């Protein structure tokens, strides 16, 4: 079973630092560092976390990223909701069975996270990721 559970909300926009400061102050969030892979995604991001471990990723909006990288789904344009799962292959199989297009990014932006992006019927971007051992 893949056991999807909410993990983070990704907010993309132009005023990244200002937006991060707003959410940090408004929701009493703590800044955290993620182990980044700059070759996969080099933009500066702000990552905040609440007391329960739910994260907020504030990133620059990049609507052309998917086209430049030949992807059907843009993982960094417009923001997304993310679910952590135990079995990314089960999610991939379910999306295939439902005929849903997706971008399987593998481990590309955050070390140890295999990320896959799809859209819901309204076009909202959804991320599923599994923590994997890279060792």
Regions found by a protein language model. Name each.
Residues 33, 128-135:
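Short beta->alpha transition motifs characteristic of CBS
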């Amino acid at each position: 079973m893949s056991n999807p559970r909410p993990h983070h909300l990704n907010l993309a926009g132009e005023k990244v630092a200002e937006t991060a400061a707003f959410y940090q102050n408004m929701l009493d969030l703590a800044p955290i560092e993620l182990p980044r892979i700059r070759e996969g995604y080099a933009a500066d991001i702000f990552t905040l976390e609440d007391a329960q471990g739910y994260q907020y990723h504030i990133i620059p909006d990049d609507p052309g990223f998917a086209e430049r990288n030949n992807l059907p789904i843009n993982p960094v344009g417009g923001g997304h909701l993310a679910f952590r799962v135990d079995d990314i292959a089960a999610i991939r199989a379910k999306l295939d069975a439902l005929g849903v297009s997706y971008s399987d990014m593998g481990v590309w932006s955050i070390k140890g996270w295999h990320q896959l992006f799809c859209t819901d019927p309204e076009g909202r971007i959804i991320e599923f990721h599994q923590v994997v051992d890279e060792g």
